[in-house]
């Protein structure tokens, strides 16, 4: 029997919200195809994330950030009906970790929010970042801003929190769908990438430390 979750995550026919695409013919589109080809060929994920010889680091990172955003979006989208104000009144990763939302607009101070509200603000915020031409230029030859990697670190740290919440609070739903292997593959790909380029502080990775040690040994 076909797995609907697998179809959603890997064929990406359905999205939680509009996803950013790469324009055919651009350098970044070619990098995206190269990255996908490595995954489809079954290449070791540790090797698949490495910067190809002669390629620009910022371009490689940009391609992966957009891809991870799309994939994490879909993972959360598949369990979002079970992540409600009632079931998850606080955005957390178990009893030891609570994530508060802060931005430059409405929430200038770290604010406790329900998980679905936090997720909605998070996805809106990331979407705004990756659609900002000043941060993620799409024209070949347009330089990335000096704060690009700093912004990427913030994006990836916040995306990691989605994995934390899903694994700790909604893994039963993932298992019920028979989709743990697919979510685990997405997580390993994400983890190896951020470790390869030092894009998330070790402290931020603590909530899933034991699971990661077993899964990504």
UniProtKB/Swiss-Prot annotation:
Q: Which UniProt keywords apply?
A: Metal-binding, Zinc
Which Pfam families does this entry report, sorted A to Z?
Mob1_phocein
Q: Does the keyword Cytoplasm apply?
A: no
Question: Membrane spanning segments where?
Answer: none
> Per the record's keyword annotation, is Translocase included, yes or no?
no
Q: Name one GO biological process term.
A: signal transduction
Annotated residues that bind Zn(2+) are located at 83, 88, 165, 170
InterPro entries associated with the record: MOB_kinase_act_fam (IPR005301), MOB_kinase_act_sf (IPR036703)
**What is the top-level taxon of the source organism?**
Eukaryota
Any one annotated GO CC term: cytoplasm
Return the Gene3D superfamilies for the record.
MOB kinase activator (1.20.140.30)
Annotated GO molecular function terms are:
metal ion binding; protein kinase activator activity
- Signal peptide start-end: none
Summarizing the function annotation, the protein's role is: May regulate the activity of kinases.
PANTHER family recorded: MPS ONE BINDER KINASE ACTIVATOR-LIKE MOB
> What family does this belong to?
Belongs to the MOB1/phocein family.
Name of the protein in question? MOB kinase activator 3A
Q: What is the lineage of its organism?
A: Eukaryota, Metazoa, Chordata, Craniata, Vertebrata
């Amino acid at each position: 029997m076909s797995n609907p979750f697998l179809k959603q995550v890997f064929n990406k026919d359905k999205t939680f919200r509009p996803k950013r695409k790469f324009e055919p013919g651009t350098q970044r589109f070619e990098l995206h195809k190269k990255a996908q080809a490595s995954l489809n060929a079954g290449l070791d994920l540790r090797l698949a994330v490495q910067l190809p010889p002669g390629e620009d680091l910022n371009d490689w990172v940009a391609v992966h950030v957009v891809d991870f955003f799309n994939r994490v979006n879909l993972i959360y989208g598949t369990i979002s009906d079970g992540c409600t104000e009632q079931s998850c009144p606080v955005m957390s990763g178990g009893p030891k970790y609570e994530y508060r939302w802060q931005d430059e607009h409405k929430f200038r101070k770290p604010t406790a929010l329900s998980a679905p509200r936090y997720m909605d603000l998070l996805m809106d915020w990331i979407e705004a970042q990756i659609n900002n031409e000043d941060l993620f230029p799409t024209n070949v030859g347009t330089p990335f801003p000096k704060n690009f990697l700093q912004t990427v670190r913030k994006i990836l740290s916040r995306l990691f929190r989605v994995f934390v919440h899903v694994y700790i609070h909604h893994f039963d739903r993932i298992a019920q769908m028979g989709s743990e292997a697919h979510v685990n593959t997405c997580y390993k790909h994400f983890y190896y990438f951020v470790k390869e380029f030092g894009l998330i502080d070790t402290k931020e990775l603590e909530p899933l430390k034991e699971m990661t040690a077993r899964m990504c040994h």
